[in-house]
Amino acid sequence: VPNAKLWDTEHPNLYTCKAIFGEDEVTETFGIRELIWNPQVGMTINGERVILRGACFHHDNGVLGACTYPETEERKMRILKENGYNAVRSAHYPCSKALLDACDRVGMLMMDEYVDVWYIHKTKYDYAGQLADWWKQDLKDMVDKDYNHPSVIMYSTGNEVAETAQKKGIALTGDMTNYLHSLDSTRPVTCGINIFFNFLSSIGLGVYSDDKAEKSAGNAEKNAAQAAGKNEKKVVKSGEKTVNKATENGKKGLGSTKPEKKKKPVGSEFYNTLACLVGDYFMKCG
C-alpha cells in the first residue's frame, strides 16, 4: 500500500481487502502497523513507545446475555477508551471477531487469551478433559481469527494455570508457546501465573476441587434462599404484625434475624495475599 496510513491507538486507520475467487467473495478489514518489543524500551507501535493501561473483562453484555453484538462491543470499548484505557485482555477465553473489529475501529489493544484451565480440573466438567486433544487446533483457530487484526498485540496461553509448576506443565508451556510462534512470529506469547497456585501444584495439591465447587454452589443457593426469606418478611400489610416464616414442624424458618458473620477472605484473594507475603521462595518446579 503506497503511502499507507498507519494504525495506532490514537489513529486507528483501517483498510479493506476484497478477495474474489470464482463466485466466492470475502472482504477483510486490516490495519498496517509495526509492533516491536524491546527489553530496554518496552513496546513500540510505529516507533512510538506505548504504556499499556489495561483491563480484564468477560464476554457477557449485561441484560443482553452471553451474546456478542457489534454495537455493544464497540460501546464497551469506547467507554473504556474515554476513561483512559488503551488495552484489554479477554478473560479467559478467545474473544469474538465482533470485539476484535471494535478494538480495531476504536484503537484498543488486545491480549487474546486461550483458556482458564489446562489438564488440572478447576471444576468437574471443565475443559481439562479435552485440552490434550484439542489445544493445537484451538490455538490455530485463535491465530486464524486474530492474525489480520492490528489491535491484537499478544497471546496468552492461560490464566492462573498451576500446571506451570510441574514438569509436564513446563513442557506444555514450551509446546504451546513454540506452536503459537510457528503460526504467528509477529506477536509475543505470555501466560497468567499465580505463585501460590504453583506452589500448591508443585506438592500435588489442587487449588480447586469438585467438592469445593459443589460446596460453594450449595452455599450460594442457601444464601439466595435466606435473602428471599428476609425480603418476604419485610413485606407487611397495614394492620398485620411481623412474623418469621416457619416450617411445618414449627422450627424457625427462612426469616432468621441473626446477624451474619463477617466473611473471611477466601479463594484467590487469600492466596494472592499470602503469595505476596511469602514471596517466590515457595515457587517450585515439581
Predicted regions and their residues:
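Aromatic-Pro/Gly-enriched surface loop or interdomain linker
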Residues: K258
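Substrate-binding/catalytic cleft of secreted carbohydrate-active enzymes
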Residues: A87-N219, K264-G286
